[in-house]
Amino acid sequence: MHLTVFLLKGIVGFLWSCWVLVGYAKGGLGDNHVHSSFIYRRLRNHERREIQREILSILGLPHRPRPFSPGKQASSAPLFMLDLYNAMTNEENPEESEYSVRASLAEETRGARKGYPASPNGYPRRIQLSRTTPLTTQSPPLASLHDTNFLNDADMVMSFVNLVERDKDFSHQRRHYKEFRFDLTQIPHGEAVTAAEFRIYKDRSNNRFENETIKISIYQIIKEYTNRDADLFLLDTRKAQALDVGWLVFDITVTSNHWVINPQNNLGLQLCAETGDGRSINVKSAGLVGRQGPQSKQPFMVAFFKASEVLLRSVRAANKRKNQNRNKSSSHQDSSRMSSVGDYNTSEQKQACKKHELYVSFRDLGWQDWIIAPEGYAAFYCDGECSFPLNAHMNATNHAIVQTLVHLMFPDHVPKPCCAPTKLNAISVLYFDDSSNVILKKYRNMVVRSCGCH
């Protein structure tokens, strides 16, 4: 019952009884040793569909994303997002990292035996710990300390690919510029932009600008004309030496908020480069990499979002109603499933309330083509008896202590306290949407940190 109610909003009890999506190992809250033996069986088609539907609902997705197939070389936006993912994950669950790594390695070994490809979505299977530097001169790009600081206020991070198909330098009245456009219509309703950046890679400039300081400016396109330059609004400017190499970052937060509220005004961005004396120069000659450059140096946009309180309250209310309806319709199925689990593990039921290990695998759902990371995560669950006397290790509430005493006097009328999570952690999931944009989203209350009697 407590698996069903508290962990993953009602479905992990089903996952546990199905065995294929989770690795189960004996061990409690105080165990230092992580057991690496996992029991699996194949899911039936209807079981897989039910689990997929429920997890997609938890992730807030109306359907399974189907992004375009990635190329052989990883592109810049997903690589940048991997750095942010590492930074966010290291903050969330550092104490569970050892178990997660072991479980992932066990799953990877099992996947190799089944013939899974080494890197199903084109990105590194083992994600290295991120390094933070103010400016990187390497490829792939690395998230800076400035970017990771944005994560503290963000629930979701989303990258956007450039939609301008022609990699062309435009010239009108002796002014050179390059255009970029990004589709922000896929942003979920109720998300507010807390920060947004445009990123473009700079190689060494043409030799004739060797001793020049180049000023690079980014503009919002306000209105376009056929016979003259567009009306522009200056967003940000950067200065770089001709020999400088690395990622240039421009603040476009104001424009992004405007585009989210008024999508019809999204006419894109213009990028211009000029010398110190104000002479406009070809953007490519300035060393700025466009569509013809390597995938790992492609320009992209990234935005940080935070859900409004109104949205959070409405989501909580909807989930509460959904869980109530689900519990009414499936109470008989849940009880039969959990009784079979109890029969399998009767001795475990008699142990005191504690945390047990549970690994949920996205890969066994066949989602490795759109979920970049993680392949799965250590969810854990709470199970065990809350019997008198309740000692300090059971993290019992005062109410649970009183309920235990009353249960001793009236066992037929008052049940024992329940073994349930007392602390829960969030997880981060990095995935593609249907437009191949990369989204990093934080999901709260997904990992059990500690258990107690309630």
Swiss-Prot record:
* CDD domains, per database record: TGF_beta_BMP5 (cd19395)
* Main location per the UniProt record: secreted
Q: What are the disulphide bonds in this sequence?
A: C353-C419, C382-C451, C386-C453
GO terms for MF:
BMP receptor binding; cytokine activity; growth factor activity
What's one Pfam family the UniProt record gives for this protein? Answer: TGFb_propeptide
- Low complexity compositional bias: what residue ranges? 326-340
Q: Which residue positions carry a glycan here? A: N211, N327, N345, N395
Query: Which key words tag this protein in UniProt?
Result: Chondrogenesis, Cleavage on pair of basic residues, Cytokine, Developmental protein, Differentiation, Disulfide bond, Glycoprotein, Growth factor, Osteogenesis, Secreted, Signal
Q: What is this protein called?
A: Bone morphogenetic protein 5
* Source organism per UniProt: Homo sapiens (Human)
